């Protein structure tokens, strides 16, 4: 075949092909491109698999440290704690919380002293009592969450123009005698000129977790309840919220985290991580709306609808219930001990710089 015929034949063959030939004319360029793409995809799959395996291995080797936390009660008052858990802030610090609800500061403290719980979450007054008993391995408070009383006064009768002096001659369920809720409420009564020995009856015979039920069952004229229990009682037609105890009492270190001195000394990284997560929770709740907070913490309150949860969160926002940081200030601690002294529950004040360990909270602010 002469050269001219060969060229014509080659041109005709190219016209029949849906793609061009390579320069040598033996392998189509499309096949080369497809081969390259397949190779790239294969390499990507292999690299992705290696990354996934390494990530899984890292997760397996980096196990979370389990912390036994004993909280005084389950309340929207502690929304920053639940937000910190739900948002994964404790996991970010390598911690996993197992929560027990003690139903009373005395029960929380008993569990911590016995080693059944690593960290307690209740009123700092419990730490003061333990220190004054002379225990060598006393309790240190390392992070504060709430800065005022979180209970609301619920009346059996509706009173849109409530005054604290309206309580004269009534029976009230304020909690356990010696606990911060009881003492704070008593402090408010005295500040409003009410003689707590003669002009009212303070029924302290009912356990903390049974107060709402006792009131709904017909006991007393008033009861102090935390949210969402206060709003639920009102929604059920069993009572009416007439006042905020915390708003009337002013700032006081109401709820804080504490542990045995020995535990803190032996586990500084855990305490620092715990405090970091608590701070993140406080900041998150501050920066988000009541509705957003309610959605995040709803799993901790399965029996409360979202609207009521949001209302409860807003109630605490309205009274400025939460600390800006986990630092427990000396003037607030002194005020707590003043309230305890006036209630007749404290003979000797405990030293602030011994009971309160702000090192971990202050590390966050550096």
What name fits each language-model region?
Residues 135, 207-301:
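Pocket-lining segment of extracytoplasmic ligand-binding domains
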Residues 337-366:
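Conserved C-terminal helix/tail region of periplasmic/extracytoplasmic solute-binding proteins
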Residues 1-66, 364-366:
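Short, low-complexity disordered leader/linker segments with a strong preference
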Residues 265-347:
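Secondary-structure end/capping motifs
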Residues 30, 61-197, 201-205, 214, ...:
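Short, glycine-/small- and polar/acidic-enriched structural segments
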Residues 77-80, 86, 105-108, 123-126, ...:
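Stable alpha-helical elements in mature extracytoplasmic
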Residues 49, 93, 140, 293-295, ...:
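Short, hydrophobic secondary-structure boundary micro-motifs
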